[in-house]
Amino acid sequence: MLGILCLSAYVIYRFRRRHLSLDDSIEDFLQNHRNLQPIRYSYSEIKKITNGFKDKLGQGGFGSVYKGKLRSGCIVAVKMLVMSKTNGQDFINEVATIGRIHHVNVVRLIGFCVEGPKWALIYDFMPNGSLDKYIFPERKNFVPLSWEILYKIALGVGRGIEYLHQGCDMQILHFDIKPHNILLDKTFAPKVSDFGLAKLYSANQSIVSLTAARGTLGYIAPELFYKNIGGVSYKADVYSFGMLLMEMVGKKRYVNAHKDDSSEMYFPSWIYDRINKGEDMEMGDATEDEKKCVRKMVIVALWCIQMKPTDRPSMSKALEMLEGDIELLKMPPKPTLYSQNMSIEDHGNNPNGIPASSCNAMITISLDGR
């Protein structure tokens, strides 16, 4: 009995010490970055803003998101974080990155709250939600976005990422570009969001160091796992952007590339063969201009997902290709799957718990029709 009491006391002590340490780390960070633009709110103010947390927008492993309203009348989204070491680091990453920047294609961080175990981040509210619900519709009667709007979204996302890479005093690498992290305002203008995995580097640093691979399965650049491909750099975001474009065009979620299904194949290879033969995708009653825009999206995506980082364009070059003349675009080499026999670099523990050998989840297309 005494042993159980001692063990319980030790667990409580460790729990309290860990959370005190987290609080201290966050407070130290905030004290050292007083010049950041976001406003610090008290927890009582957060409760008023959300009207007692009545309108819940969503929930995830990080915590919950609520709709709120500032005294100015501005509608906001309030992300309440569950206290943990991971979420504490995510909180610091968010405030450190988007707390210092402003761009039309990057979500704006309005404020935050740190009050004991109560952590919150306050953003501009995006009424049209995230991009994934438009390219992976779950409702049968869902009206898809036009190809023209999808093309404009692709351009906006590219501009947002380009700004992160080149438009700030520091180089910001996002490391988690995917449809779920692209929010859409009332005019469907895209905003890059969720900077929990982002890292800040010197603007002139071409290769960066990481202690662990980071990102979401299917969008992670191969160099984060395989050492003989090349160093980790802003080209990792370029790769993720390419996979995002592929999903926007293919309108298919990621599945296991090793699934034994003869009706499915690796989508980039399939679409590469079509484009290389001069064939268009089946796009219904799309106009010729829309077909050209989608063709550009595909070719740019194929360049962005090249295996070696050195073969991928910068975001500036990718945007130049997206905005340029389709006739001037050259086809890149055919994309390949990650090779299973490449040596794996030890980047530490994978935060997603995904072994490197399983990072071959690829987008597929059904040959029986969508």
Label the model's feature ranges.
Residues M1-R34, D132-K140, L200-S202, L217, ...:
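Terminal membrane/secretory targeting segments in land-plant proteins
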Residues F91-A96:
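Regulatory alphaC helix of protein kinase catalytic domains
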Residues Y66-M83, T97, R108:
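Glycine-rich ATP phosphate-binding loop
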Residues I110-P117, P127:
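Short beta-strand micro-motifs within the conserved protein kinase catalytic domain, predominantly
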Residues G116-D124, D132-K133:
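A conserved loop-to-beta-strand element in the N-lobe of protein kinase catalytic cores
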Residues M1, S21-D23, V76, D261-S262, ...:
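Intrinsically disordered, low-complexity cytosolic regulatory tails
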